[in-house]
Amino acid sequence: MAASLRHMAHFQKALLVARSAPRISTIVRATSTLNDGASKVPDHSMHFKLERLWAVGMLPILPASYFIHGPVMDAVLTVALTLHIHWGIHGVVYDYARPYVIGEAAAKAAHVGVYLITGLLLGALLHFNTNDVGITKAFELVFSL
């Protein structure tokens, strides 16, 4: 019993010394929050809404282009399709061709490639509209087969 009391006194003394000693690890209050990284990323919600509104706005253009032919409808359909395709490809590249996945140089090349494809598509459709029957007349010819 005497040994256990001696051990208890030794334990209490060690506990008091431990409480009065400086801490090895102290709590450091940081001024940052978990949302600091999120504030650096641009907000794409407005782009997403605009893309959806654009897709809904294209719904009446597609059937109307079957019945209305002319350079104005060709230009409207060309711009609408080009923007819609550009935003779709851009979204895929933005989501899947990130620098930490495929590398910095490949990610930049992928983003440049999106604009290159968009420019080529717009140029090809405008060339087709001016030097051939036009995109609306071409749709009518395809559907008449």
Swiss-Prot record:
Keywords noted in UniProt: Electron transport, Heme, Iron, Membrane, Metal-binding, Mitochondrion, Mitochondrion inner membrane, Transit peptide, Transmembrane, Transmembrane helix, Transport, Tricarboxylic acid cycle
Lineage summary: Eukaryota, Metazoa, Ecdysozoa, Nematoda, Chromadorea
GO molecular function annotation: heme binding; metal ion binding; ubiquinone binding
Protein origin, superkingdom: Eukaryota
Mitochondrial intermembrane side: 68-74, 130-145
Membrane topology per record: Multi-pass membrane protein
Coiled-coil stretches: none
Keyword Zinc: no
UniProt binding sites for a ubiquinone: 96
Biological process according to GO: mitochondrial electron transport, succinate to ubiquinone; tricarboxylic acid cycle
Compartment(s) where it occurs, according to its Swiss-Prot or TrEMBL record: Mitochondrion inner membrane
Segment forming the signal sequence: none
CDD domains in the record: SQR_TypeC_CybS
Function: Membrane-anchoring subunit of succinate dehydrogenase (SDH) that is involved in complex II of the mitochondrial electron transport chain and is responsible for transferring electrons from succinate to ubiquinone (coenzyme Q).
Knocked-out gene: effects: Increased sensitivity to phosphine.
Pfam families, sorted: CybS
Positions of heme binding: 84
Protein name listed in UniProt: Putative succinate dehydrogenase [ubiquinone] cytochrome b small subunit, mitochondrial
Pathway linked to the protein: Carbohydrate metabolism; tricarboxylic acid cycle
Quaternary structure and interacting proteins, as annotated: Forms part of complex II containing four subunits: a flavoprotein (FP), an iron-sulfur protein (IP) and a cytochrome b composed of a large and a small subunit.
Species in which this protein is naturally found: Caenorhabditis elegans
Spans within the Mitochondrial matrix topological domain: 1-45, 96-108
Entry's family note: Belongs to the CybS family.
Residues annotated as transmembrane: 46-67, 75-95, 109-129
